[in-house]
Structures are given as C-alpha cells and as structure tokens.
Amino acid sequence: MLSPKRTKFRKQQRGRMRGVATRGNKIAFGQFALQAQECGWITSRQIEASRRAMTRYVKRGGQIWIRIFPDKPVTMRPAETRMGSGKGNPEFWVAVIKPGRILFEMGGEEITESIAREAMRLAQYKLPIKTKFIALAEGETPTQVGKASSASLANLDEDANSQTDDETSSSGSVATVES
C-alpha cells in the first residue's frame, strides 16, 4: 500500500476540505480518467483496491496512472482508553480529495472507451466519494504534467528573443539625473 517514505512530522491535524481542486484537475497522461465530484479522504487501502479492480478488468491491455498519493497520517487512540494523555499514534494514511481532482487515468492503444468506462466503474465501487468518468475529446492530447513540449519551448525562446530585441532598440539613450 502507498505511504510516504519519511515525513517532517509524524502527526497532522485533520483540517478542512473547502473549495475545488485547482491542481491535478486535467487529464495529463492517458485518454480516460476518473474525476472526483465531492470532497473526502481516500485511504491507501481504497486506492489499492481500486487499482486492483481496474488492472484485473483491463488485464495487460493498457496503462493505469494513479494521480493521488496518501500523504496525510490519521491517528487513532486504542480502544477503551480514557480521555486525555495525548494524541493517538498514526494508524493509516489518506489522500485529501477536493471536487474536480483526477484520481486515476487510463490509456493505451488497446483500451477502448467501453473497456475504460467499465474498469473505472469497478474502481468507483471501492471509493467513498462520488466520481465521474471523463474522456479526452477527439483530437485532444493530454497536457503532460511537468513536461514542456518542444513546440512550446520553441515558442518561449522566440518570445524571449523578441523581448530582448525590443528592449535593446527602445533603450537608445539613458538620461541621468544629477542632484
């Protein structure tokens, strides 16, 4: 199951889940995805159960990307203990999910929309929140997270060169003010 290798602090406060996901809300790797419709916590066990359900249905056909990671520790006190005497020990890990967050992605040459939809439906049953199936439109490509395409890098270089040319041509003379 998923859990961080090491963390700065062992315990966290529970926190609140307000608003919608502004990051991780677009398809980045595959053609099909499962998107959260409401907020909640998803445990590492639920993520693993969903992953197994999808891979069992897809078999060897395509590729599955897990877009969430359980990085929040949830503490629990032992049963039948009295109040007080500090916070309990970390028992399991959860991923904090906001509406709009992409949970899983699926893609590959052998994956059709019907196969992906059924695999995601099986994964939905393992999750404690409402989700929906989304697919890329025809001709649309996934936005690669953290990877800039060579075309976009070329456009950035051209923009930077044109800005430096404009700056050198417009800064013909410099006036100094003496006091």
Swiss-Prot record:
What's a single GO MF annotation on this record? rRNA binding
One Pfam family of this chain: Ribosomal_L16
| Classification via CDD domains | Ribosomal_L16_L10e (cd01433)
**What is one term from the GO cellular component aspect held by the record?**
ribosome
| Domain of life the protein comes from | Bacteria
Identify the stretch(es) annotated as Disordered: 147-179
Q: Which HAMAP family match?
A: Ribosomal_uL16 (MF_01342)
Q: Report quaternary structure and partners.
A: Part of the 50S ribosomal subunit.
Q: What does the UniProt function comment say about this protein?
A: Binds 23S rRNA and is also seen to make contacts with the A and possibly P site tRNAs.
| Designated name of the protein | Large ribosomal subunit protein uL16
